[in-house]
Amino acid sequence: MDQELDELFSLLMDEEQLLPIEELSALSDLDTRQLDRFSSCWQSLSPQRRRTLLATLGQQADEHVELLFDSINCLVLDDPDPTIRKIAIGNLWESTDPSFPAAFLTALNEDSSIIVRSAAADALGRFVLLTELEDDSLTESDQIVDDLLRTIRDGASSELHRACVKSLGFSSREEAQVIIADAYLSEDEDLVQSALIAMGRSANPVWRPEILQELLHPSPLIRAEAARAAGELELHDAAQSLVELLEDVSNEVIHIAIWSLGQLGGDVARTALLNIQASAPDPETVKKADEALEHLAFLEGTPDLLIYDFDDSAEDAVD
């Protein structure tokens, strides 16, 4: 392993070469001694090489669940480059390690960079959700919501404000609901999008009227988030509006409407998904319809024949 790491470090420090993607798995789950050696290598890398490496490690962890780079991400949480700190927090977003909320709260409250504070606010949303799911191991649960609320009340920048609103969507506290409502009623389109994301995360059907209304909004960005929220909250009376969005001018809106119909299920959703699966002009939309129909079949406990290729079957019969 030591020789493998030495070879990898040499490759990383040769910045005229592309990152050795296949060899990066050697950085997974480093022990303390190995992490010290990585730190020495890290210090010799240029800022751009560091950013590229850390972002690539995040991508590799997403694609290969057996890879764990948490120790490296934790190591660089105090890197002088704010972009590195932001990437590291993003890479740790899915971790439920109980030691991370304190680090993210420190970043939210004390970091000098708005992009880092915003990343921390985003990451804290996962721990708000865990609290709502009655995870008693999170001792900072009240402080997380309190600090997100306080950050907004202290006049956060637009980017940070939006991140806090989205994370507060996971909270059932009344103050959080007020913040979401205020964001929705603002005249800031970006903030309205964040409010709709928060509504979808809330598991609270109280937001049904707002979501149904925004499915008709002139902005495709607003329509997209409303469509997503309708699926997340399983608003069955949104089905017909979602079907109409399958003819939207925006591919993003179409794809999210497809996903949401798969979440809703029912005859209306199934018929619409089968129709677009058969008639969509591009492979990506067909793929989205396939996935939604597979999910719908899973929800309804029906036989999943959707991946059966009838054309191939016919050819086999002829042969």
Provide a role label for each language-model segment.
Residues 1-65, 297, 306, 314-319:
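N-terminal alpha-helical scaffold/docking segments in eukaryotic complex subunits
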Residues 2-7, 30-43, 63-78, 97-110, ...:
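Amphipathic alpha-helical scaffolding segments comprising HEAT/armadillo-like alpha-solenoid repeats
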Residues 17-18, 32, 47-51, 82-83, ...:
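Alpha-helix N-cap/helix-start positions at coil->helix boundaries
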Residues 18-21, 51-55, 86-87, 102, ...:
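Alpha-solenoid HEAT/ARM repeat scaffold
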Residues 53, 57, 123-129, 173, ...:
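Hydrophobic residues within the alpha-helices of tandem HEAT/HEAT-like
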Residues 58, 93, 125-126, 169, ...:
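Structural signature of alpha-helical solenoid repeat scaffolds
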Residues 274, 278-319:
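Eukaryotic acidic, Ser/Thr-rich intrinsically disordered low-complexity regions
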